[in-house]
Swiss-Prot record:
Residues 10-277 form the tr-type G domain. GO terms for cellular component: cytosol. This is Peptide chain release factor 3. GO terms for molecular function: GTP binding; GTPase activity; translation release factor activity, codon nonspecific; translation release factor activity, codon specific. One of its GO terms (biological process) is regulation of translational termination. It is found in: Cytoplasm. InterPro entries: EF-G-like_DII, EFG_III/V, G_TR_CS, P-loop_NTPase, PrfC, RF3_C, RF3_dom_3_sf, RF3_GTP-bd. GTP binds at residues 19-26, 87-91, 141-144. PROSITE patterns: G_TR_1 (PS00301), G_TR_2 (PS51722). Belongs to the TRAFAC class translation factor GTPase superfamily. Classic translation factor GTPase family. PrfC subfamily. It comes from Listeria monocytogenes serotype 4a (strain HCC23). Gene3D superfamilies: P-loop containing nucleotide triphosphate hydrolases, Peptide chain release factor 3, domain III, Translation factors. The gene is prfC. Keywords: Cytoplasm, GTP-binding, Nucleotide-binding, Protein biosynthesis. Increases the formation of ribosomal termination complexes and stimulates activities of RF-1 and RF-2. It binds guanine nucleotides and has strong preference for UGA stop codons. It may interact directly with the ribosome. The stimulation of RF-1 and RF-2 is significantly reduced by GTP and GDP, but not by GMP.
Length: 522
């Protein structure tokens, strides 16, 4: 790989933003895009009446409900780095899509609501990041409102998440009393409300301001200095190595809504966040600077533009250089393909991509060739990256088309939404009626909404009273083993499994059939 290309790859910073719903994830995403010069003003998800919707929320149901249910991909340049942001679903039901997204990034930014602290969804996503060993940067948001005390938030972060923390800055007051941020890294105080030339006040060797200033009269100024002294003496030592290893999280305080502390966070993040690294494959570790092009499909999205009825496969480039029109191999099928139609996104705005390098995320127009987890490369025709995990659904519904004359629309919609991973599909053993499985209730709502809006198919869904899926070997697939509490079905790959009513039904099945092995996904 040439030095120029190595430099280009090193400039990539690809990360996901994770949080609990309503922690301010979409707002901070928009402020980052503002600093990247991509948008002129940040729209707010909550201001529905203004008609301004969040840049990253493009699907109709997201605009209506103010939640992210798909993962958007956004790119911009900042201070010599090419930033790729993946805005993950902020709703607890969408763990599958989020998990796949986290497989495609090199670091994560965790947004926490200062009033609520660590919430269930944040903890779940954090564990996935820890499992992958990627660096986690923490932004404690909503400091313009009254919330938990900063020291309490730090203690919660360390106790609940089990990770070292190092505050990069420290709030001087909060809510109506918020006066500024004491920036330990850049050795300045950033004022909350000030003229531009007075926004950053330099600190002296003693840790106090070099020159006297009105901010020192703030009720919380002396308290902040005392807390900083405590952190210096009793807190964790700053360690770039531990940050990169995912063992220490740098913590930033701020307010995304008032755009306070966000640019300082971005500037520091760009300094610390890792560039694209290696990926495990069946042929060993593939380094980002490997000259051969390779990547994997982590997401498929149909109807991003309803007018065009298109379908996009999102690929994370793992190594080498992509050039539009290049020939590659889809290793699952061994099929040779020409990548002529490639695109990059800013929510629902798109532009053609002529070249991209390791770390970049691009969209490929898909006519049905790709599946989630596919590897494509112009190197070894047998190369395959690690499989993306699939979750075991916990809710199941039988699904029918209301209008039997529109079966074609119905089947096309189900097939496409299953292929993009929006829902999982099962079929009854003999009659092959459709049963759909989801991790959470909202997935069914999104499925119904998209079937109606994108495929013109009104559907009816009925609960089947089963909650647990367990796969069996083909030789053990006997319909006579089905009971009122268990049901033999097949998945989209025709693999047999039983759907059980509850744990009691599984235990009963195991007692009656000790030789049959039941297996689960994640």
């Amino acid at each position: 790989m040439s030095q120029d290309l190595q430099k280009e790859v090193a400039s990539r910073k690809t990360f996901a933003i994770i949080s609990h719903p309503d922690a301010g994830k979409t707002t901070i995403t928009e402020q980052l895009l503002l600093f990247g010069g991509v948008i002129r003003s940040a729209g707010t998800v909550k201001g529905k009446k203004s008609g301004k919707f969040a840049t990253s929320d493009w699907m109709e149901i997201e605009k209506q409900r103010g939640i992210s249910v798909t993962s958007s991909v956004m790119q911009f340049d900042y201070n010599g780095s090419r930033i790729n942001i993946l805005d993950t679903p902020g709703h607890s039901d969408f763990s599958e899509d989020t998990y796949r997204t986290l497989m495609a990034v090199d670091s994560a930014v965790m947004v926490i609501d200062a009033a609520k602290g660590i919430e269930a969804q944040t903890l779940k996503l954090f564990k996935v990041c820890r499992m992958r060993g990627i660096p986690i940067f923490t932004f404690i948001n909503k400091m313009d409102r009254q919330g938990k005390m900063p020291l309490e938030l730090l203690a919660e972060l360390e106790e609940v998440l089990g990770i070292e923390s190092y505050p990069m800055n420290w709030p001087i007051g909060m809510g109506k009393e918020l006066a500024g941020l004491y920036d330990r890294y850049h050795r300045v105080i950033e004022q909350y409300r000030s003229e531009e030339d007075e926004r950053f006040l330099p600190l002296g060797e003693d840790g106090d301001l070099k020159e006297a200033h009105a901010i020192q009269k703030s009720l919380y100024y002396d308290q902040a200095l005392e807390e900083i002294m405590l952190l210096d003496e009793a807190g964790n030592d700053f360690s770039r190595e531990r940050i990169i290893a995912g063992e220490q999280t740098p913590v930033f305080f701020g307010s995304a809504l008032t755009n306070f502390g966000v640019e300082t966070f971005l500037r520091t993040f760009v300094d610390f966040a890792p560039s694209p690294s290696s990926h495990e494959s069946n042929e060993g570790v593939i380094e980002a600077d490997n000259p051969k092009f390779s990547g994997f499909i982590f997401k498929i999205q149909a109807n991003m533009n309803p007018a065009h009825r298109d379908r996009i496969a999102f690929i994370r480039i793992c190594s080498g250089e992509f050039e539009r029109g290049m020939n590659v191999t889809l290793t699952r099928t061994g099929k040779s393909m020409k990548l002529a139609n490639s695109t990059q996104f800013m929510a629902d705005d798109r532009e053609t991509v002529n070249r991209a390098v390791a770390g970049d995320i691009i969209g490929l127009y898909d006519t049905g060739n790709y599946q989630i987890g596919d590897t494509i490369t112009n190197g070894s025709k047998k190369l395959e990256f690690e499989k993306l995990p699939q979750f075991t659904p916990e809710l199941f519904m039988r699904v029918y088309a209301k209008n039997v004359m529109k079966q074609k629309h119905f089947h096309k919609g189900v097939e496409q939404l299953v292929q993009e991973g929006a829902i999982q599909l099962f079929k009854t053993w003999r009659t092959e009626e459709y049963i759909i499985g989801a991790v959470g209730q909202l997935q069914f709502e999104v499925f119904e909404h998209r079937m109606r809006g994108e495929y013109n198919s009104e559907i009816r869904m009925e609960p089947i009273g089963k909650k647990i899926a367990r796969w069996v070997k083909e030789e053990d697939a006997d319909e006579k083993l089905s009971t009122a509490r268990s049901m033999l079905v097949k998945d989209r790959f025709d693999q047999p499994l039983f759907l059980f009513e509850n744990e009691f039904a599984i235990n009963w099945f195991n007692d009656k059939n000790p030789d049959i092995e039941l297996t689960s996904l994640l």
